[in-house]
Amino acid sequence: MKITRLTTYHAAPRWLFLKVETDEGITGWGEPVIEGRARSVEAAVHELAGYVVGKDPARINDLWQTMYRAGFYRGGAILMSAIAGIDQALWDIKGKALGVPVYELLGGLVRDRMKTYRWVGGDRPGAIIAQINDYRALGFDTFKFNGTEEMKLIDSARAVDAAVVKVAEIRETFGNSIDFGIDFHGRVGAPMAKALLRELEPFKPLFVEEPVLAEQAEYYPRLAASTCIPLAAGERMFSRFEFKNVLCAGGIGMVQPDLSHAGGITECVKIAAMAEAYDVGFAPHCPLGPIALAACLHVDFVSHNAVLQEQSIGIHYNEGADLLDYVINKEDFHCVDGSIAALPKPGLGVEINEDMLKRANENPPDWRNPVWRHADGSIAEW
């Protein structure tokens, strides 16, 4: 079997899909995308096509290493996202060719169902309690929301109190009947992160995500030493080499690589295993589309330290399409009590409605994240 062609499709709300075709008629799908940089990743995918077209798709490890090492310059968000989408499609092809789900190729199941959580609120968190009530009625008991709006490097007691009041209200309303993670989203500098963590501790969040930017990872051990809240990070780390440094330094209780950003299935299986060796949980980042979610689930199902899976149904970014709109076999992704069962179909287990995708590609949105500014006019972290 040989790879014959790579085709990309843009689709609402902010996704890029990749179709990899072979001379035996078996097709694989991937989702290579950086939110807000889809066209940059698309260009990288087609540059990398020269390394894979004409090659045997079953040699996934060799193709991965070739895409990564054949160029003198390597790594980073764009290239690793391009590799990720191609890698996902290669695993999809191999599973379909052998008639088994990808998790069987990775050693088989360690669990039957994977617990997921729902996003509530928005970029500037609001209406959280009402949304939690709606989703609890559907069986969900674990949620995540943004912890702050813009926050200056050194900010006021008022800014801290505004963040804490929201969390206090949620815990007061629901007691211990729900769990929630709080996403700082890299908006908080190290000085304020320490203050916020101290004030949030009484409300027992499940985790705090991106307490500081990945560029400030040296603060993770110091922040962890100041709080009992588990710290999570990883959506803006793109290879096992970046995770190696963080795991060696300590401080993170849960790693969150993105299967569409951090080299795909091949790389993230290694990251999960590295984290397990450090007694660190694995909870892939995935506010993306159905192929990315399927890839995450296959790694979750073979990783003993997988604890939670993000998924984007109803997330505030999904304008114009929701998670399963381009999926034919929606029933396989049905959540029961907040969990998704092992995907039964061969490959990644997601059947894409290509006709619908082609129509979406005719006039897709060119999504960009908001640009925020502080009151003094300086740019703020989004």
UniProtKB/Swiss-Prot annotation:
GO terms for biological process: amino acid catabolic process; D-galactonate catabolic process. The record marks D258 as: Increases basicity of active site His. Keywords: Lyase, Magnesium, Metal-binding. One of its GO terms (molecular function) is galactonate dehydratase activity. It catalyses: D-galactonate = 2-dehydro-3-deoxy-D-galactonate + H2O. The record marks E310 as: Transition state stabilizer. It holds the Pfam family MR_MLE_C. Its EC number is 4.2.1.6. It is an enzyme of class 4 (lyase). The active site is at H185 (proton donor), H285 (proton acceptor). Mg(2+) binds at D183, E209, E235. Binds 1 Mg(2+) ion per subunit. Its cofactor is Mg(2+). Gene3D superfamilies: Enolase-like C-terminal domain, Enolase-like, N-terminal domain. Coiled coil: none annotated. Pathway: Carbohydrate acid metabolism; D-galactonate degradation; D-glyceraldehyde 3-phosphate and pyruvate from D-galactonate: step 1/3. NCBIfam families: PRK14017.1. Belongs to the mandelate racemase/muconate lactonizing enzyme family. GalD subfamily. Reaction proceeds via an anti dehydration. PANTHER family: D-GALACTONATE DEHYDRATASE (PTHR48080:SF2), D-GALACTONATE DEHYDRATASE-RELATED (PTHR48080). Catalyzes the dehydration of D-galactonate to 2-keto-3-deoxy-D-galactonate. This is D-galactonate dehydratase.
